[in-house]
């Protein structure tokens, strides 16, 4: 069941890739993908290329995939391990969602952080109290880690 669904999503992604994202299996393992997200142009992550790993559980799509950033990113909803605080990857997951939708949600999270549900409270606090400092730090990290 899971592998059939994953294969279908891969075909759909190749046919109609989401803007500024790409994804596919690592080697022959259909349950382990790598994705690339281009930093949105209207964000401090602009120009960056962010690597993301995707692990599908055996009972996908009834359980959400585990998605994590491999590239360091300065963001209130993404911690130093690359974990992402995104409702659709947790309690808001639905089998109707696809990897394509997940990648688009991550792109919009880069553009519009959610400081009220932070994974990194210090960055959320900076975002709320000194947005210029947050944006310049995020830009610096993007240049340092995502423009290799």
From Swiss-Prot:
Induction or repression: Not induced by heat shock or wounding.
Active-site residues, record numbering mapped to chain: 85 (glycyl thioester intermediate)
Record InterPro entries: UBQ-conjugat_E2_core, UBQ-conjugating_AS, UBQ-conjugating_enzyme/RWD
SUPFAM superfamilies reported in the protein's UniProt record: UBC-like
Enzyme superclass (EC): transferase
GO MF term set: ATP binding; transferase activity
PROSITE patterns: UBC_1, UBC_2
Signal peptide: none
Metabolic or biological pathway: Protein modification; protein sumoylation
EC number from the UniProt entry: 2.3.2.-
Segments forming domain UBC core: 1-147
Biological role: Accepts the ubiquitin-like protein SUMO/SMT3 from the E1 complex and catalyzes its covalent attachment to other proteins. Mediates the selective degradation of short-lived and abnormal proteins.
Quaternary structure, from the entry: Interacts with CHIP.
Family: Belongs to the ubiquitin-conjugating enzyme family.
Listed name of the protein: SUMO-conjugating enzyme UBC9
Native organism: Arabidopsis thaliana
Record gene name: UBC9
């Amino acid at each position: 069941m899971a592998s059939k669904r994953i294969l279908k999503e891969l075909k759909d992604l190749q046919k109609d890739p989401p803007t500024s994202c790409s994804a596919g299996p690592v080697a022959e393992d259909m349950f382990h993908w790598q994705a690339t997200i281009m930093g949105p142009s209207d964000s401090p992550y602009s120009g960056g290329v962010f690597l993301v790993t995707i692990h599908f559980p055996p009972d996908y799509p009834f359980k959400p995939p585990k998605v994590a950033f491999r590239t360091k990113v300065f963001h209130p909803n993404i911690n130093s391990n690359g974990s992402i605080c995104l409702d659709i990857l947790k309690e808001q997951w639905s089998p109707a969602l696809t990897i394509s939708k997940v990648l688009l949600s991550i792109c919009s999270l880069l553009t519009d952080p959610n400081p009220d549900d932070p994974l990194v409270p210090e960055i959320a606090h900076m975002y709320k109290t000194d947005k210029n400092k947050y944006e310049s730090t995020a830009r610096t990290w993007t240049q340092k880690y995502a423009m290799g």
